[in-house]
């Protein structure tokens, strides 16, 4: 590693730092984008790892109370010190990050740009645990890495970079663990957002530059069936990569929600999409609906999902047609922040069933929509209680929070929406389930060959049980349409 950076640090230029001949142009647009993703650093103590020649150091120092800038290449650090000599709140430290020592709770934010991809999995996990100790509770870690493959065009006689998949970073980050003194409470990282750097998409048609923002939070496994975070529950239990592809085989290419492309076309037609509009898809899955909307209506779509496995597949598919205005991010809709009036449409298919406080989420949707903006949701709902014991067990096992169709619609009205339509589409749901079950049985041999006999049985049994729950009146399927009033304010 030292040898690699000795070769690429002789001039301490931005081209060497970014390993790209167009670095100056990229940096001009990328820098404000990266900084805009940070949490507030006003009066914060910031640790910058891999500070390099100081592309970000000075900007951090303008707002933070103090910045500790660390890099293991003295030539880069000397250039950083020269460029940022007017800032009196920066400490420059030449060190290997794997050997760093700081007191517990020393920093509010840890910032890193292109560093972790030079560490082994073992070194990175060790650093994750260290950063958890160094950060105060509620503190944030921001980092950005090259994923999948090389992005810069600089020639390299050898390349020690580890081009991980985004899901691998998620798994390593969430494996980190800090036991607090007295064994009272443990801490770990929880994802706030992970997304591709838009500058690279626009200028280089490259979705492989990915950044993350995580928060140090207390850990309680009880709430996620033994998993440390809800995201781990989704990726490890319900939406493993194999499980996602298994669902796609039933729903149709690109889809993991009821009815696949057919219901997507039906429901999207209700939105009267116009070219240039901005659409937010909450729980985008593997992106089929996003690609359809972008291609058919020339809209700009942002797909968000908490499952890193889902988004990783969507990002892989996005590289097949770089002309489509589609972006994907791993994020939690209950924590994500967008500027008010950012979108013309918010769209969500069979996803909000995982979220407990639906009313609070709908208020967020309201703020994010422009006046006159439209909301379209399909979601699992429930019949009136008491439920059967089988349905109680099913809901608990899946971690669902379900309401009746009418209650769901009432939440939307209370959040400020108008022209609310809350339709019980259970009959359509049953019809779709029967067709999907029939189609699955017709390709039994093909399905088993591609997946396994257990996977086939899982689908057939699962769909049959959905039909039973609908027959019993426990499980419902709702379609919801609503609009933000044209003259309403955001003060809901």
Give a label for each model feature.
Residues 125-137, 359-374:
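A short glycine-rich, Lys/Arg-flanked "PGG" loop and its adjoining helix->strand segment in the class I
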Residues 149-154, 161-171, 175-182, 372-429:
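Conserved catalytic/acceptor-binding region of the Class I
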Residues 47, 52-99, 280-282, 286-335:
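Class I SAM-dependent methyltransferase SAM/SAH-binding core
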Residues 1-43, 49-101, 119-126, 140-230, ...:
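Class I (Rossmann-like) S-adenosyl-L-methionine-dependent methyltransferase catalytic domain
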Residues 100-110, 335-345:
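A short acidic, Gly/Pro-enriched loop at the edge of an enzyme's catalytic core
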Residues 39-45, 272-278:
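Short helix-loop-beta connector
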Residues 108-122, 345-357:
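A short SAM/SAH-binding and catalytic strip from SAM-dependent methyltransferases
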Residues 185-226, 421-492:
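Conserved Class I S-adenosyl-L-methionine
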